[in-house]
Amino acid sequence: MFYSLIINDLYINAVYRIIFGVASKKMCIFAQTKTKIQTINGLFMELKGTKTEANLKAAFAGESQAHTKYLYYASKAKKEGYVQIGNLFEETAKNEKEHAKIWFKYLHGGEIPSTEVNLTDAADGENFEWTDMYAEFAATAREEGFADIAFLFEKVGAIEKTHEERYRKLLGNVKEGVVFSRDEDMIWECSNCGHIVVGKKAPELCPVCKHPKSYFMLRADNY
């Protein structure tokens, strides 16, 4: 794995704030989570605040960046007729993704947090992106004469705002227990086989493909 980008302090700060839970100048639940880990000899040690914690964050950020970058490289290689090279880029990207997962789990007590926690973190991260990060990036780009880049920073920031709104809505559904049930009849669709059910709740099991309730979602006819 290699890193070809020159990463300055502003970029590193932005990445850390997005990934590790500092949003809108306030610490979210990830940053407050205790990160005690069990060592090979059975001792529990506090990871938070150590150099190793900082190294784990840097490793996660680097592996995540490499994963995304290698997927771009794979696509380009295949377009240029190098299918084997493209496949190897994709294989390596999968490796980097798994490396990133190892470090991410160490930073969160050894496991991926719950969906409710993840939705909160994701919403806070998107909020930081559109309220702070992209606004600051756009202002800097415009001051330096890069109007086209400033425009894109602003437009992507606007997209991140809709991402935050979506995560907040989904978080509310999880907290209120209405992901798979509503007060009125709704159209539920199995995302595996397409079976349709009308009612206040999604069935515990799809009667057609036997997939569990978790595969059902509210049908959205927007075409």
Language model region names:
Residues 31-32, 211:
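Intrinsic-disorder/low-complexity coil detector
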